[in-house]
Amino acid sequence: MYTYMEYLQKCFYKSTNWNEDNIFSNITATSQAILEFPIPNGFKIDSSSKTTDYSASSFTLSNNHQINGSLAYLYSSVPLKNTMGTKDVSLQDAIAGFRIIEPMVRLQPKFNNKAPHSKSSLLYGRMYFPGSALEAMIIKRISENTQLLIKCVNNPHLSKNGTMIVYLQNNTAKYSREFIYSTNESLIGLRCLYNLGTPTSSSTVSSFNPRTIPKFDNSVVSIGTELWFATRSMSPGLSGALRYSTRSTSTGKPLTMTLAINPILGHISSTYTVKTSVASTFCSRYDFNVFSYASNLSLGFELYSYANKKRSDFYNHEIYSSSEENKYLKQHPELQKHHRVPIRAYKHHDNRTIINPIHNLDNVYHINPTLLSTTSGSGHTSETVTTAFQNLVNESDFSSVLKFSTSLNDKVVKILWEGRLRDFLVSTGVKLSLNPVTNTPEFNKLGISFSYAL
């Protein structure tokens, strides 16, 4: 679960059209969210408030062997009007999970020159107690595609009482570049990510003809690398990664595959993540070392639960009521008795109207061939199905999510439940491992955290 400050940072990126998925460090973010999710340790409560559209504060208190706390502040030069509190926020926005990688879109130059957020900035600071540990972050947008990110940590337990990392990031539809410098070991780094294919213009997206778009436009292939060099210890670092993300043209379900290689350490890691339904995701990862021949297989899944267990009978349709349908029922109480909502027509970008092209709008997605064109508009069919699936995921009203991951070689099992309890977001989980001596399971982590934000 994201902290409230992390959530505001993501809203800042969305408000300023900054694509996080186009950064090399996030190339395996989907598999990490399902396999390497953190488990709360002890008891923790977080209370946050957005005083204005430009500023917010957060207070955290935890009890893990001793009482600790922190106080944080955030300021944004861009009004964060698209944020919500823990009572109304969607779980898809509050919890790290499957990321749908969108095809590349190049903004028009005239839009870039007049963009009001081309010089936007974000300031963040946190103070921990007891003790004198501090952390800060500055995000300064230099241009529409370039920003400066500075992270600082001040802690008496660190070498020279702290460290600072500077990122100069350039993010475009075709590629992204990062120049990194850290005061720790005087580390210098370079990250690059290149997207194969030709980016689509934003004007083309708003007025495209689906017959002219091939099916592979739903796929995104990205290849990247990172180079590191510690000037003090004269130690180099090198790694590369490949990501392939696509969506099925028949069901609209997305999947992501990645391959990461570290030639210096001889480590190879491959992942496969697929959204098997609107409310479930499965992920697998295989790690192998060419020097030691050590290998490991990790498996994980996440399963969402709907807030409203009653299904809505859409004549021949059977889906869980999304937030949009719930709003419609509130406006028309006479329909609540039978839980029936009229089927709304889907309007495509070229102003053609399609009346419900999906026969059974459930997690399986059965296609009704009598309602789909069998002529040259096959590209239109695939575009409609993928859009319908994504809209259904975004509009679904979920109340909780259950995450599970295990590793065969490490013999570790992690279980995490995150959901909404009244006005709070709750996260609780456990981490179990097998004792190598007694071969009995033992608890490594066990905790619960509460988050409240206005």
Swiss-Prot record:
Pfam families, per the entry: MDM10
Keyword Ligase in annotation: no
Keywords, ordered alphabetically: Membrane, Mitochondrion, Mitochondrion outer membrane, Transmembrane, Transmembrane beta strand
Superkingdom of this protein's organism: Eukaryota
GO BP term, example: mitochondrial genome maintenance
Membrane topology qualifier: Multi-pass membrane protein
InterPro entries in alphabetical order: Mdm10
GO CC annotations, alphabetized: ERMES complex; SAM complex
Location of the protein in the cell: Mitochondrion outer membrane
Function of the molecule: Component of the ERMES/MDM complex, which serves as a molecular tether to connect the endoplasmic reticulum and mitochondria. Components of this complex are involved in the control of mitochondrial shape and protein biogenesis and may function in phospholipid exchange. MDM10 is involved in the late assembly steps of the general translocase of the mitochondrial outer membrane (TOM complex). Functions in the TOM40-specific route of the assembly of outer membrane beta-barrel proteins, including the association of TOM40 with the receptor TOM22 and small TOM proteins.
Entry's family note: Belongs to the MDM10 family.
UniProt note: domains: Lacks alpha-helical transmembrane segments, suggesting that it resides in the membrane via beta-sheet conformations similar to those predicted for other outer membrane proteins and porin.
Subunit architecture: Component of the ER-mitochondria encounter structure (ERMES) or MDM complex, composed of MMM1, MDM10, MDM12 and MDM34. Associates with the mitochondrial outer membrane sorting assembly machinery SAM(core) complex.
Protein name as annotated: Mitochondrial distribution and morphology protein 10
Species, as recorded: Candida tropicalis (strain ATCC MYA-3404 / T1) (Yeast)
Source lineage: Eukaryota, Fungi, Dikarya, Ascomycota, Saccharomycotina
Gene of this entry: MDM10
